[in-house]
From Swiss-Prot:
The keyword Ribosomal protein does not apply. Its EC number is 6.1.1.22. One of its GO terms (biological process) is asparaginyl-tRNA aminoacylation. This is Asparagine--tRNA ligase.
Amino acid sequence: MENTLIKSIYRDTPAYLNQELQISGWVRTLRVSKSFGFIEINDGSFFKGIQVVFEEDLNNFEEIAKVATGSSLIIKGLLVESPGAKQPFELKAQSIMIEGACSGDYPLQKKRHSFEYLRTIAHLRPRTNTFAAVFRVRSLVAYAIHKFFQDKGFVYIHTPIITGSDAEGAGEMFRVTTLDLDALPRTEEGRIDYAKDFFGKETNLTVSGQLNAETYCMAFRNVYTFGPTFRAENSNTARHAAEFWMIEPEIAFADLQDDMELAEEMMKYLISYVLEHAPEEMAFFNEFVDKTLFDRLDNIVNSDFGRLTYTEAIEILQKEKERFEFPVEWGADLQTEHERFLTEQIFKKPVFVVDYPKDIKAFYMRLNDDQKTVAAMDLLVPGVGEIIGGSQREERLDYLEKRMAELGLHKEDYSWYLDLRKYGGTRHAGYGLGFERVIMYLTGISNIRDVVAFPRTVKNADF
């Protein structure tokens, strides 16, 4: 007999009622009396499990009555309407086979475990309700990202993980080397001789696929990259991880306004997609993780996102500067408390802040006519602050070369990037969206370590 997925039973119950079925899955809970027992089984196909009823006429009743939480079972039985109010149906077991017994020291017992504890058993935490919901939503959002861009005709570009350039100009990168660390080759000046390394030069793990994506934007018009990125920031906060995924579209013949319109459309699409395709998981998050979740997401889907310049934002914030821990001054980056005040107290909806001072933004952003600001945008959302950062890219070769010189970037390291401006360059724009930040926002989970399967953070690379 073929296995029937629990998801199929929930989605098309009438087709399975009063039918003999076989299911397989893991024991979540077990309750036994003298002559019968109840097992909650989850098979991984659906957020909810199914109740299995077994009675003393089962040929291995005594064995099943002692089965441990976490054990895997194969069960044949008749699906019937449940007399209890807690579930619409149950499986009356005709046979139960133990596929894999579970040891008595199984860490996941029937009680609430803290997120901190569950991080220490990251290989087992997907078996809990919370993390089953988190990672199913993560899977759905990943699919929705591809669907959104593919339906709009974007081309998906696989950008390299190993790179010889720093896309952000920040320098906080993980080094890639095959050199013997106990006997490093040196140049005459005493520096490490990377000419003897695997690639013949200094290489790192990528912090962004943007620069590489721009090359394909100049051929395919609209492209996106979606993959892992790495930041060696010594930042041990709930929002930072050393390894995370980024969504980075690039659009040609486009300016900052086009960039913001794409970002707004994408955010609304992702939220609507998850609410439609993961209703059980989202209801769980709204009830047990963040009771304002549905209201917050509904506000995004049904709002026209606000717009204001960085200068206007500073003027608003300076009128309320006494309430902030960090100072508010033109030329300084906005802190999370500033961002949240703007989006939660002033606009009460998502808002784009545009035209930031050039000195706090990356070299590739287009210089505005005032010569002081660049065509950059950040999307701020209630509850989080900044969630997307983007810009119109500098398409003018002379402006780009001047900006690189100001920042001490070597033209030879970016010659291929400069070529894009020499050979038929166009106006183009793009943005970056941290995938984990989206999952946190969609689920209400407050720590990035709890939306990554095996988080990589400062002093932590377990599993």
